[in-house]
């Protein structure tokens, strides 16, 4: 089976590439060149028939991913499907099913069947439930069986923590972290490695993993098991050593035509973000960077969507290609529907803010909003807003008598005042 990368290397412009080129207003040659060299990916499993393809990477708009899925404390698949509907409503490009309890295949199959967004999973989360074995009883190649099952089901990308190998764990053990390993998948693999006194199975059998990805054109999202879970731990030796391992794994994947993106931090002080984005691009030769946040402070519990949006905007402006949303429930509980909505909107704002910096053409929508505000065209403002539904609701909650203003300024509306005076009209404030 040929992947999007293989086709690009041969100069074949696939239907998925055509769709992405039209969405992003890019030329055929630009897209082919950058997919061929790995700077742009189009995650598109051959079995995901409902997919509306999107590209991730150099010269493209920053994409947003929404996480959902059940845990052993919250098993309500119907609510998770409502989150999927909400993600579709806001035009989210990627959805990850992070279910880590029970038999997850039925939900995942339904997700692939109905979702036009690209679907991602973390197979190691599903290992215990799928294999019906406790962690210590799982064999190295058993993990590949889970990967194969996910690939065959139609998921477009998978987080695989292949970089936390024996070399990286050696560096980690010497680190003086406050929060050790905060990646769920990374912690599970590290525990397995320590209990079995064995190498990371995804690293040891990486070539077998690539064969699975090739068969279904699954994009590898190389997970950062050693991402910083606190600003104290950011940019330390453990994080960077794993990134170096991921750069080597990226090249091995490219050599056979498997598409790759790199996952990144995490928690990180705002002044470290730009350098980390540049470091990933340098080490991984321009591979797309997919970051969680980053959260720029550790004390925003209940408001971590704000911390994440601040970091995400800086990251996107500095080269990050996809942002994983953060909700107000981060670090506290499984998010509910309102949490998901708040997280989506905050992250879409961050992504767009970053795009204004790196893709000047993306300012056009903002300019249209500014014109609508000057013209006091409320309906146009609601249409252009990222969350126009909420904007309209808030406006109507204290609807002004004079629609040439809002209830904040009333007759002292600056826009209306200037519109009148520049037309040569008198301005009355009584």
Swiss-Prot record:
Keywords: 4Fe-4S, Iron, Iron-sulfur, Lyase, Metal-binding, S-adenosyl-L-methionine, Thiamine biosynthesis, Zinc. GO terms for molecular function: 4 iron, 4 sulfur cluster binding; carbon-carbon lyase activity; zinc ion binding. Pathway: Cofactor biosynthesis; thiamine diphosphate biosynthesis. Substrate binds at residues 67, 96, 125, 161, 183-185, 224-227, 263, 290. Zn(2+) binds at residues 267, 331. InterPro entries: ThiC, ThiC/Bza_core_dom, ThiC/BzaA/B. GO terms for cellular component: cytosol. Its cofactor is [4Fe-4S] cluster. Binds 1 [4Fe-4S] cluster per subunit. The cluster is coordinated with 3 cysteines and an exchangeable S-adenosyl-L-methionine. One of its GO terms (biological process) is thiamine diphosphate biosynthetic process. [4Fe-4S] cluster binds at residues 406, 409, 413. Pfam families: ThiC_Rad_SAM (PF01964). Its EC number is 4.1.99.17. It catalyses: 5-amino-1-(5-phospho-beta-D-ribosyl)imidazole + S-adenosyl-L-methionine = 4-amino-2-methyl-5-(phosphooxymethyl)pyrimidine + CO + 5'-deoxyadenosine + formate + L-methionine + 3 H(+). Homodimer. Catalyzes the synthesis of the hydroxymethylpyrimidine phosphate (HMP-P) moiety of thiamine from aminoimidazole ribotide (AIR) in a radical S-adenosyl-L-methionine (SAM)-dependent reaction. Belongs to the ThiC family. PANTHER family: PHOSPHOMETHYLPYRIMIDINE SYNTHASE, CHLOROPLASTIC (PTHR30557:SF1), THIAMINE BIOSYNTHESIS PROTEIN THIC (PTHR30557). This is Phosphomethylpyrimidine synthase. It comes from Campylobacter jejuni subsp. doylei (strain ATCC BAA-1458 / RM4099 / 269.97).
